[in-house]
């Protein structure tokens, strides 16, 4: 692996601290009036998701983490996990639910997902930022609902995601959803 100096720290850089892969979320260079300059960074652990702050003296170096991303198509799921396929090599990768339970509600067959790999092992799966999903269940919008200030109602998508949608959305309609927040973005015209 390549070593990087504190002068090369930037947001988005993947580094290894104590044998664990981290993503730099924030980097502040501090030059006090007295003493040595240092970098105060906020990093997120790829394996646990925990965010911590670390301080490095100016000129120190750390190793970059062998974290890469690979685009793969979701094929199907079963009791054990989900199966993805590389569109170029047609290799299939089965990922157990314990690694991807947080995105289970966004799994839609024949959709491209980003698999995050560390030293060749899958450590996570990221869904597309926006997805178009069909509303499977929702209560009908009743005339006069807006008078009470209620403009959103609960709904369940065809993938099982529970979201809030405007009262004019009905079952069977396709909506665009932001998977980062789980929020409704817009109605998709057919």
Curated annotation (Swiss-Prot):
The keyword Cytoplasm belongs to this UniProt entry's keyword annotation: yes
A GO biological process held by the record: peptide biosynthetic process
Family: Belongs to the elongation factor P family.
Keywords (A to Z) from UniProt: Cytoplasm, Elongation factor, Protein biosynthesis
Annotated localization: Cytoplasm
An example Gene Ontology CC term for this record: cytoplasm
Protein name in the entry: Elongation factor P 2
MF term (GO), any: translation elongation factor activity
Superkingdom of origin organism: Bacteria
Lineage: Bacteria, Pseudomonadati, Chlamydiota, Chlamydiia, Chlamydiales
Function: Involved in peptide bond synthesis. Stimulates efficient translation and peptide-bond synthesis on native or reconstituted 70S ribosomes in vitro. Probably functions indirectly by altering the affinity of the ribosome for aminoacyl-tRNA, thus increasing their reactivity as acceptors for peptidyl transferase.
Predominant cellular place of this UniProt entry's protein: cytoplasm
Pathway: Protein biosynthesis; polypeptide chain elongation
Species of origin: Chlamydia caviae (strain ATCC VR-813 / DSM 19441 / 03DC25 / GPIC) (Chlamydophila caviae)
